[in-house]
């Protein structure tokens, strides 16, 4: 059963401005493992990665029903599988977490669905 669905959309330029203004911005948003991957990237791809993680974590917090505030960015970790698909490797939700990210026209969108485990 679906517990929640959250969507977020961000402008890449807004995330880039925040990052350029304060280098600690990435450390606030990203876990150690995410930061390691982030530091391997360069240019536009680096900003897309950071914006994608930001949007996905915001979308999760909306699906969870708390928003960021009751939930910290560090409570959530998104890694990529062998095919490059993102997945939540850390979250407070014990069920299945579905995530979709898309980048286009200077925007990133994230959709997160929380599905409770069947207990029947």
From Swiss-Prot:
Any one GO cellular component localisation term in the record: cytoplasm
Residue ranges of the TM segments: none
Residues noted as binding Mg(2+) in the record, renumbered to the chain: 8, 58
InterPro entries, sorted: 4-PPantetheinyl_Trfase_dom, 4-PPantetheinyl_Trfase_dom_sf, ACPS, Ppantetheine-prot_Trfase_dom
Annotated EC: 2.7.8.7
Keywords: Cytoplasm, Fatty acid biosynthesis, Fatty acid metabolism, Lipid biosynthesis, Lipid metabolism, Magnesium, Metal-binding, Transferase
Pfam families: ACPS (PF01648)
Localization in the cell: Cytoplasm
Main location: cytoplasm
Catalytic activities: apo-[ACP] + CoA = holo-[ACP] + adenosine 3',5'-bisphosphate + H(+)
GO molecular function: holo-[acyl-carrier-protein] synthase activity; magnesium ion binding
Essential cofactor(s): Mg(2+)
Function: Transfers the 4'-phosphopantetheine moiety from coenzyme A to a Ser of acyl-carrier-protein.
HAMAP family: AcpS
Name recorded for this polypeptide: Holo-[acyl-carrier-protein] synthase
Source species: Streptococcus sanguinis (strain SK36)
